[in-house]
Design a protein with these regions (language model features):
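Central cavity-lining transmembrane alpha-helices of secondary-active solute carriers
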Residues: 26-47, 233-245
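Helix-to-loop junctions at the C-terminal end of transmembrane segments
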Residues: 40-53, 140, 242-254, 339
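Cytoplasmic helix-loop-helix junction between adjacent transmembrane helices
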Residues: 88-125
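Hydrophobic core of transmembrane alpha-helices in multi-pass small-molecule transporters
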Residues: 81-96, 201, 281-295
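Helix-loop boundary and gating motifs at the non-cytosolic
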Residues: 1-39, 192-231
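Structural signature of the two symmetry-related core transmembrane helices
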Residues: 56-71, 153, 257-272
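Juxtamembrane intracellular "pre-TM" segments in multi-pass secondary transporters
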Residues: 169-199, 380-381
Length: 381
């Protein structure tokens, strides 16, 4: 619920606290939602969830988030930038639960229903966030960052209590299988799906390049809190509209086509931000952005949970997340370099070109037939 305004206002808040665009880019690469720490923690969380249960990892992620927002609120309340660095690290650690949540969903949901259920959950997550993001934009001048961050901590505490009361491990997830802890064992498993991993790694890097520091860049173009609030409202509308192709039609038109459509929409939106960054077009960009998300994420979830073996599902989902996050580190760093060298539009233009290039990888490595479980075949790449 609160991530709707955190996601949109976090970077502008940091600008107001005195952080530069370059510093924000480095922080996002190292310890942000898509940074190095975030990626490394996910493979650890996924692997341990296979052998020790999903529940405790999910609760740990929520606890880290509560600490994150309390630390960030203290940083803004007392004007202590050093605490922002700690908040970034805690935020990265909180994401250890992401692949665990996906693995738990796959444990309980049958294959034909996974993409539809996942799309429904996307809507349930985005719509409340859009409302809070919109009102935060409208009243951002009277509600300071510490107040909104404390609200986030409070809402996450409620979420933790609900998780503690309701979430239970399924028998298969609590088996005593001892997963090998060597990196070589994980690498051997990943090598069977090199092309599959490559598609999602390329997508992650391209989107990080095009949008990784977007909100910080928009802050330099005189966009207001009201503008950011409008973006927070319209992006989830795109998610709602895109739920139909993203979830309900995965098995009818194929995940492959949905992934390509998502990339084309995303690249078009990124080019729009690059060359037409005007407030009048914010609703259009927000809806297209949300539609791209809702077309991509359920298809990725469906493909991942089908292709990865059940006994190592948490580990492989974590490995995929880690691969995606580690390659994403490059995006904000390149974006900062392009911004400093060539100006505002360069990062988004380069990101759009990379997104278009990923369509070729999708055509090469994602199979057409989605009528049943994907079959592994020897990789020639």
């Amino acid at each position: 619920m609160y991530l709707g305004y955190i996601r949109v206002f976090w970077q502008p808040w940091l600008i107001g606290l005195g952080f530069s665009v370059a510093t924000i880019g480095i922080l996002e690469s190292g310890a942000g939602r898509f940074g190095a720490i975030s990626g490394l923690t996910q493979v650890i969380g996924g692997r341990f969830s296979d052998s020790r249960g999903r529940r405790r990892l999910i609760l740990a992620g929520s606890a880290f988030l509560i600490t994150t927002w309390l630390t960030a609120a203290t940083a803004f309340l007392f004007g202590a930038p050093m605490l922002v660095y700690l908040a970034y690290v805690l935020w990265g650690l909180s994401l250890l639960s992401l692949p665990v949540i996906d693995a738990m969903m796959a444990d309980y949901i049958e294959i034909p229903d996974r993409s539809r259920v996942y799309s429904t959950m996307l809507v349930a997550n985005f719509v409340p966030g859009s409302i809070t993001g919109f009102f935060a934009g409208q009243y951002g001048s009277s509600l300071s960052p510490p107040v909104l961050l404390l609200l986030a901590a409070g809402l996450e505490t409620v979420g933790f209590a609900l998780l503690f009361a309701k979430v239970r491990d399924k028998g298969a997830a609590t088996s005593t299988r001892k997963a090998p802890l060597s990196l070589m064992a994980t690498w051997d498993a990943i090598s069977q799906f090199r092309g599959f991993f490559g598609v999602f790694m390329m997508d992650s890097m391209a989107w990080a390049l095009g949008t990784g520091i977007l909100y910080a860049l928009l802050s330099t173009r005189s966009f207001t809190l009201i503008d950011f609030g409008l973006l927070a409202l319209t992006q989830p509308l795109g998610v709602v509209v895109g739920t139909v192709p993203g979830g309900w039609l995965t098995h009818r038109i194929g995940a492959r086509r949905l992934l390509m459509a998502s990339e084309i929409l995303g690249a078009s939106m990124t080019l729009g931000w690059a060359f037409y960054p005007v407030a009048l077009l914010i609703p259009l960009y927000g809806i297209v952005w949300g539609f791209a998300i809702s077309s991509w994420v359920p298809a990725q979830f469906h493909l991942s949970t089908v292709i990865f073996p059940e006994a190592r599902r948490g580990e492989m989902l974590g490995a995929l997340a880690t691969s995606i996050y580690l390659i994403r580190i490059v995006g904000p760093i390149l974006a900062v370099g392009l911004y400093l060298a060539l100006g505002y539009s360069a990062p988004m233009t380069a990101g759009a070109a990379a997104i278009f290039a990923n369509v070729i990888l999708i055509m090469k490595f994602i199979p057409r037939d989605q009528s049943g479980p994907l079959k592994r075949k020897p990789q020639s790449n």
